[in-house]
């Protein structure tokens, strides 16, 4: 048995050079220029076809979509509720009346949120008649004014701190927008405290949402739309250094807007906790 001869470094280097380019056959990396050309042509045609197929599929799908109204809306049984300002942790508001920095961010968020509701920002909107849905048929859709004065003590006009410095904080509650929704009745957002150490005031009175703000026609069609708001002001009983209360709000006053569902306990309702320290 003879041992396999070990190639020298120069022999291995020469073979690699020959593999990279063979001057006698004109091959580069083992293929002729014609072979490389055919392979590149194949992949160019193959991936070009895939790109064209993907583009056509996307185009065909987009033709079925309406740019102004969602195609599928039957799975939204009833709107939910949202609160503002955004809580620091999981629907809990905690602050100290004697420490402005603890509620400074909440006040700033409320100011920013209510800025589009100022008189100046709404001067080009329509003063709509109360008590009835504002039905429109386009192509131009007008948006109704929502006077911030309806929020009374929570408007930021009479109290720049929205009640936080006095231990009577304001929380804004709004109903999620659903295109073309018209409430069957007179919608309102009803809020009650779970504990007996506080009372709740709502603005507008009884948390009423005027029908003139319905229906909503979508972001692109209904430019300038102002969503109706309900302000909830928590008023604690005096005499306690630490005051806590959980507030539950739900949609009421209509037959088609639900607030109970075994599968979705948050449908048409929201609850939040307020903790105020001296």
From Swiss-Prot:
Q: Which UniProt keywords apply?
A: Cell membrane, Disulfide bond, Glycoprotein, Ion transport, Membrane, Potassium, Potassium transport, Signal-anchor, Sodium, Sodium transport, Sodium/potassium transport, Transmembrane, Transmembrane helix, Transport
- Segments in the Cytoplasmic topological domain: 1-35
Task: Kindly state one GO CC term assigned in the UniProt record.
Answer: basolateral plasma membrane
Q: How does it sit in the membrane?
A: Single-pass type II membrane protein
Glycan-modified residues: 124, 197
Residues annotated as transmembrane: 36-56
The record's disulfide annotation reads: 128-144, 154-170, 191-249
A Pfam family the protein falls into: Na_K-ATPase
Say if the entry is tagged with keyword Cell wall biogenesis/degradation.
no
User: Keyword Transmembrane helix, does the record have it?
Assistant: yes
Q: Where is this region: immunoglobulin-like?
A: 186-278
Tell me, what does this protein do in biology?
Answer: This is the non-catalytic component of the active enzyme, which catalyzes the hydrolysis of ATP coupled with the exchange of Na(+) and K(+) ions across the plasma membrane. The exact function of the beta-3 subunit is not known.
Sorted alphabetically, which NCBIfam families does this protein's record hold?
Answer: Na_K_ATPase_bet
- Which family is this protein grouped under? Belongs to the X(+)/potassium ATPases subunit beta family.
Q: What is known of its domains?
A: The C-terminal lobe folds into an immunoglobulin-like domain and may mediate cell adhesion properties.
Q: What is this protein called?
A: Sodium/potassium-transporting ATPase subunit beta-3
Which species does this protein come from? Mus musculus (Mouse)
Its gene is Atp1b3
């Amino acid at each position: 048995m003879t041992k396999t001869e070990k190639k020298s470094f120069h022999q291995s280097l020469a073979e690699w050079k020959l593999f990279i380019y063979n001057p006698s056959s004109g091959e580069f990396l083992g293929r002729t220029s014609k072979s490389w050309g055919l392979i590149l042509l194949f992949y160019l045609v193959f991936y070009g076809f895939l790109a064209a197929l993907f583009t056509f599929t996307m185009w065909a799908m987009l033709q079925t979509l309406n740019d102004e109204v969602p195609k599928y809306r039957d799975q939204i049984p009833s709107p939910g509720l949202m609160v503002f300002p955004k809580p620091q942790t999981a629907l809990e508001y905690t602050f100290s009346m004697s420490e402005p920095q603890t509620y400074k961010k909440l006040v700033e968020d409320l100011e920013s949120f209510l800025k589009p509701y100022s008189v100046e920002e709404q001067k080009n909107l329509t003063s709509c008649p109360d008590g009835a849905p504002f039905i429109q048929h386009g192509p131009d859709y007008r948006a109704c004014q929502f006077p911030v004065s309806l929020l009374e003590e929570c408007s930021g006009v009479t109290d720049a701190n929205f009640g936080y410095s006095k231990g009577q904080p304001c929380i804004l509650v709004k109903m999620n927008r659903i295109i073309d929704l018209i409430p069957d009745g007179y919608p309102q957002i009803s809020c009650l405290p779970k504990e007996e150490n506080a009372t709740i005031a709502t603005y507008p009175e009884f948390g009423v949402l005027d029908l003139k703000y319905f229906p909503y026609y979508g972001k692109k069609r209904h430019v300038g739309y102002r969503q109706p708001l309900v302000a909830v002001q928590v008023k604690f009983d005096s005499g306690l250094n630490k005051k806590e209360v959980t507030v539950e709000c739900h949609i009421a006053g209509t037959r088609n807007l639900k607030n109970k569902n075994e599968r979705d306990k948050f449908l048409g309702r929201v609850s939040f906790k307020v903790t105020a320290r001296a």
